[in-house]
Amino acid sequence: MMKNKYSLNEEEIHLFQQSVAGTKRINQDTVLHSPRRKKTSYIAPERIQQEQIDASYYFSDEFQPNLDSEGPTRYVRGDTNHYELKKLRRGDYSPELFLDLHGLTQMQAKQEIGALIAACRREHVYCACIMHGHGKHILKQQTPLWLAQHPDIIAFHQAPKEWGGNAALLILIELDEP
């Protein structure tokens, strides 16, 4: 039998009973305090749909950007410091939004990636994670090609293990100045 780490001897129990003598048990009040929620602004469904269309407009299946085939999947826009890639690789950025493409068709994946980019810009999210998975390697091959075509993508790199490893990409999105 294990001895309780915080067991009290009889003297301590008696002292406690004396100190709480004459107190009454409080009944639970019925007031429930709900956590304060961040005020979310209403976004018209038409605007969201237009943002998705605008963002997926850039994704062509015919265009083949010149991506480095050696090593992990990575890309940095020409006007961006290559140090951003190193920070992505090391996991210095934590993604705030995640997109899981498992089970989607190429067309659905393009729409969802477009929606993710639009949501990141709207919510001022600089780093996001796209999980394309392994599967038949179709989305794994196509996702970087689509992302490299989009003007709002600053850089992307194969995600560190904690964010999905070689089955995911961390992306940096260009944001409008607030």
Swiss-Prot record:
Smr domain location = 99-174
Q: Which Pfam families match?
A: Smr
Identify the keywords attached in UniProt to this record, alphabetized.
Endonuclease, Hydrolase, Nuclease, RNA-binding, rRNA-binding
Recorded family membership: Belongs to the SmrB family.
Instruction: Please tell me whether the keyword RNA-binding is annotated for this protein.
Output: yes
Instruction: Report whether Hydrolase shows up as a keyword of the record.
Output: yes
Role, per record:
Acts as a ribosome collision sensor. Detects stalled/collided disomes (pairs of ribosomes where the leading ribosome is stalled and a second ribosome has collided with it) and endonucleolytically cleaves mRNA at the 5' boundary of the stalled ribosome. Stalled/collided disomes form a new interface (primarily via the 30S subunits) that binds SmrB. Cleaved mRNA becomes available for tmRNA ligation, leading to ribosomal subunit dissociation and rescue of stalled ribosomes.
Q: How does it assemble?
A: Associates with collided ribosomes, but not with correctly translating polysomes.
Uppermost EC category? hydrolase
Database matches in PANTHER family: DNA ENDONUCLEASE SMRA-RELATED (PTHR35562), UPF0115 PROTEIN YFCN (PTHR35562:SF1)
Q: Give the superkingdom in one word.
A: Bacteria
Name of the protein in its database record: Ribosome rescue factor SmrB
Q: Which GO terms describe its biological process?
A: rescue of stalled ribosome
Query: EC number(s) for this protein?
Result: 3.1.-.-
Q: Which GO terms describe its molecular function?
A: RNA endonuclease activity; rRNA binding
